[in-house]
From Swiss-Prot:
GO terms for cellular component: ribonucleoprotein complex; ribosome. Coiled coil: none annotated. GO terms for biological process: translation. Disulfide bonds: none annotated. GO terms for molecular function: structural constituent of ribosome. It comes from the Bacteria. Keywords: Ribonucleoprotein, Ribosomal protein. Belongs to the bacterial ribosomal protein bL28 family. Pfam families: Ribosomal_L28. This is Large ribosomal subunit protein bL28. InterPro entries: Ribosomal_bL28, Ribosomal_bL28/bL31-like_sf, Ribosomal_bL28_bact-type, Ribosomal_bL28_sf.
Length: 87
């Protein structure tokens, strides 16, 4: 199952985790130094939700991001799902 939100097309993005060592100058140290730079994936916040669609009079099971859930509630479930071709 792909880690993609079907409504907003959010997908995993690549980034890096930067590891720092030392004491900050503001706290009396000589400054932070970067000691590592590890590649990683930032995953979308996907949730399994059952959303009620009044026009169809039934619940639809979706795997959507938390941001997409807010969009559904704001613009209406039927219009968004119809626009994206999910129903």
């Amino acid at each position: 199952m792909p880690r993609i939100c079907p409504i907003l097309d959010k997908r995993p993005t690549r980034g890096r985790k930067i590891i720092r060592k030392g004491k900050a100058k503001k706290k009396g140290g000589i400054g932070l130094h970067t000691t590592g730079n590890t590649p990683r994936l930032f995953l979308p916040n996907l949730r399994n939700k059952k959303v009620y669609v009044p026009e169809l009079a039934k619940k639809v099971s979706l795997r959507i991001s938390a941001r997409a859930l807010k969009t559904l509630m704001k613009k209406g479930t039927y219009t968004i799902l119809k626009e994206k071709g999910l129903i």
